[in-house]
Design a protein with these regions (language model features):
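Acidic, surface-exposed loops and disordered segments
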Residues: 1-88
Length: 88
């Protein structure tokens, strides 16, 4: 779960950028991943609050995104696109 300060204007954007970089690195290592944007709701729940307390994270932080990782089952292929536009 990606957390950021509650009273910082760019917390959500910072977490999104950090999450994107984590997913790019994971992909380069052959690990698949997905970023889920339910962090606020999850961490605001009773379960989320208990988890933050258990991990020693104070209430000045809130969740923004979750990242799940795993190894893809088989190889993935990207279909060739003929309609690409190049600027240069």
């Amino acid at each position: 779960t990606l957390l950021g300060p509650k009273n910082f204007l760019y917390s959500e954007a910072d977490c999104a950028v950090a999450g994107e970089n984590m997913l790019l690195m994971a992909s380069s290592l052959g690990i698949g991943g997905c970023m889920i944007s339910r962090g606020k709701e999850t961490m605001a729940s009773e379960y989320g609050q208990a988890l933050l307390k258990e991990k020693g994270i104070n209430d000045n932080y809130q969740g923004f995104y979750h990242i799940i990782l795993g190894y893809p089952q088989g190889k993935t292929f990207v279909k060739a696109r003929k309609d690409r536009v190049y600027y240069g």
